[in-house]
Amino acid sequence: MREPAFWYRPRSPESQILRPLGALYGAITARRMALQGFDAGIPVICVGNYHVGGAGKTPTVLALTKLLRELGETPVVLSRGYGGRLQGPVMVDGARHIAADVGDEPLMMARDVPVVVARDRLDGVALAKSQGATVILMDDGFQNPRLLKDASLIVIDSERGIGNGKVFPAGPLRAPLKAQLARTDALVLIGDGRAANDVAAELAKRNKPELRARLKPDAASVAQLFGKRVFAFAGIGDPERFFRTLRASGIDVARTRRFDDHHMFSPEEIAALAAEAQREQLTLVTTEKDLARLRGSEGVPNGIVPFAVQLEFDDPAKLRQLISDHLYKARERRFGRR
């Protein structure tokens, strides 16, 4: 779904018209969030958003995976598998699954970390534990009460913020902000923008930490594209952020094309992109998430370059201490010891 432009305007007639629906949706979601979740028996760390659309959850999950391994843990990512047909529970296998099976994000992450896809998160937990998981990393699911969460980290793009502050469909919020703030343990702000400073200030009043991070382009990806004119395309939550990252890396972006988030490319669309790039002597470049979807499509031309990024935290020691503390508290609550 492509986000309506009015979601990111302070005031709009569309938002006012939809506000009653947003109030109803928000009340239902807030009530669900207050329900007691099932205790997985091992620590559960949730990486979520306050709003619909992309904000950097996937690179945050991958960064936390790396940290947890450094701490001696065996993390397994639990995903609902948005866009995939399999109900699960299933352990994602890049050799036999495509994005249409398990979703693009799980398929992409499975290259680096064990990923379980399950519509029913309790079934997913059981499979993850059978594979030796000592920590569950929930990719999304902050508003879902099914599992008890030991820590919830909320990711926000600091350039975009949370829009007009209204609840879907009047705005991008998945639930009333107050209800979501109350269940947040830390805020991850990606980039140097100020659009989410008010949210950070509200959480600071609750003694909840703010963690600044930024997306760093992979050096090999930059080198592969250096000196070339590129045709960049993306079907993610915020394609413009991808295009900005390319330009900020010194890459000559001659043409761009945006698609809806999680867009499944048809053979005709792929052929049209390739023909346009060839006609103008451009190199096709896309995100790793988009490439995960393309790998399951017919007629994908050779030469599409995936542009890799990774999340780097400004204060890694602060993040390490935060996660260590939550793991300790989670185990102390269950077992009375570390």
UniProtKB/Swiss-Prot annotation:
Record's keyword terms, sorted: ATP-binding, Kinase, Lipid A biosynthesis, Lipid biosynthesis, Lipid metabolism, Nucleotide-binding, Transferase
GO biological process, one term: lipopolysaccharide core region biosynthetic process
UniProt superkingdom: Bacteria
Coiled coil: none
Biochemical pathway: Glycolipid biosynthesis; lipid IV(A) biosynthesis; lipid IV(A) from (3R)-3-hydroxytetradecanoyl-[acyl-carrier-protein] and UDP-N-acetyl-alpha-D-glucosamine: step 6/6
Enzyme Commission numbers on file: 2.7.1.130
Short name of any one Pfam family annotated for the protein: LpxK
GO cellular component labels: plasma membrane
Binding site for ATP: 51-58
GO function term, MF aspect, one: tetraacyldisaccharide 4'-kinase activity
Catalysis: reaction(s): a lipid A disaccharide + ATP = a lipid IVA + ADP + H(+)
SUPFAM superfamilies: P-loop containing nucleoside triphosphate hydrolases
Classification via NCBIfam families: lpxK
Protein family membership: Belongs to the LpxK family.
Physiological role: Transfers the gamma-phosphate of ATP to the 4'-position of a tetraacyldisaccharide 1-phosphate intermediate (termed DS-1-P) to form tetraacyldisaccharide 1,4'-bis-phosphate (lipid IVA).
Protein name: Tetraacyldisaccharide 4'-kinase
Taxonomy of the source species: Bacteria, Pseudomonadati, Pseudomonadota, Alphaproteobacteria, Hyphomicrobiales
